[in-house]
Each structure stands twice: as C-alpha cells, then as structure tokens.
C-alpha cells in the first residue's frame, strides 16, 4: 500500500504532504526522517526516478519540472503502481499550480490543499482493483525494473549517489509520454469501477422520480 506522500521542490522547500493518521505517523516516524535525508540529497542532476529500499518499506520518487514527488510504500507494493501513482500526482499538481510552485518567497506547505487529491488517488491505488490493472501496466508502461534501485544504508551512510545514468535517463525520457497516458487511463478505469455502478443507480433513480412526479 501507499502509506505517505510528500511534494517538495528540489531546493528543499516542502510544497504539500499527505495528512496521515496517528498509526501511520507512529509506524513511519523513522522512515519519514529518512525521507527528509533523501530529499536533501536530490539535485537537478539526480536520477529522475528511483526506488530506495529501507526495511519493510520502499521510497519511490519522481522528479518533474523541478519538483520531487516521493511516496513511502510497503515493500510488497508493486513498483509499477507506485510510479503510476506518482505520475498522476505530478500531472495534477502541475496542471493545478504550474510555475506558481516555483516562485520565490513561498511559505512551506503553501499547497496543503493538494492533500485532498492525494488522498483520493491513494484510495484508488490502494484498492485490490488497482492490482488487477497490472496486466495492462505490464505491456503499456516503461519497464520499471530498470529504474535505479538503492538501499537506504548505501545511500545515506556509504556515500552512494543518486546522480543519473545517461542511458537510463534517455530511455525514461523517451517513454515518458506513453507512460503518462497509460497511467492516466488505468486510473480512470479504476475510478469508474469504484464509482460507476453507484452513479448509474443514482441516475436511474432521478429519472424514475422525474417520470413519477413531474412527467
């Protein structure tokens, strides 16, 4: 499952973060500290996508337009879904706030209202139906097994770098448009499966009421 999410500029300014319940805050206390250390290591030359393993959890991050989207997931959570989730957040955040998020003088967490979208997306990606869509992701999205993977000890305590590898970066840029389109379609299908039947029933009820009392 996706447990927690942060949105941070590459200069270190936090823009938004998911509001997590007390249990999640307690269980992820040390991992959130590690997340802050990871974010401090990032720069414009860092790998644009990476996964960093730490015990029972994995950090996945995506850098887009000078902004880093980072989520903490259970180690068993499919990497493809994690990056699809981050792509969805990146697209929505940039469409909603754009270059406003890059302006100087912003206060920390200036876009706290983005938590509403993060929570909705997290619920969708944490449903069993999301895992059912993995077959589509397998054929339509970039092979994320090639995404840089690090161990938290190697990164924070042994001096490993998150600087990008040229061949991997070019491959990721080449597939970015296809990845984003496929991820959005999978998310829309998951939303339809979750809310479509209720919407149809509500529409039929309204038609019946109109026909019964106003026709």
Swiss-Prot record:
Gene Ontology cellular component terms for the protein in this record: endoplasmic reticulum membrane; ER to Golgi transport vesicle membrane; Golgi membrane; SNARE complex
Pfam families given in the database record: Longin (PF13774), Synaptobrevin (PF00957)
Higher taxonomy: Eukaryota, Fungi, Dikarya, Ascomycota, Taphrinomycotina
Source organism of this protein record: Schizosaccharomyces pombe (strain 972 / ATCC 24843)
UniProt keyword annotations, A-Z: Coiled coil, Endoplasmic reticulum, ER-Golgi transport, Golgi apparatus, Membrane, Protein transport, Transmembrane, Transmembrane helix, Transport
Residue span(s) of domain v-SNARE coiled-coil homology: 133-193
GO molecular function (one): SNAP receptor activity
SMART domains: Longin
Protein name: Protein transport protein sec22
PANTHER family (UniProt xref): VESICLE-TRAFFICKING PROTEIN SEC22B
Topology with respect to the bilayer: Single-pass type IV membrane protein
Regions of this protein lying in the Cytoplasmic compartment: 1-194
Free-text function comment from the UniProt entry: Nonessential SNARE involved in targeting and fusion of ER-derived transport vesicles with the Golgi complex as well as Golgi-derived retrograde transport vesicles with the ER.
Alphabetical GO biological process terms: endoplasmic reticulum to Golgi vesicle-mediated transport; intracellular protein transport; retrograde vesicle-mediated transport, Golgi to endoplasmic reticulum; vesicle fusion with Golgi apparatus
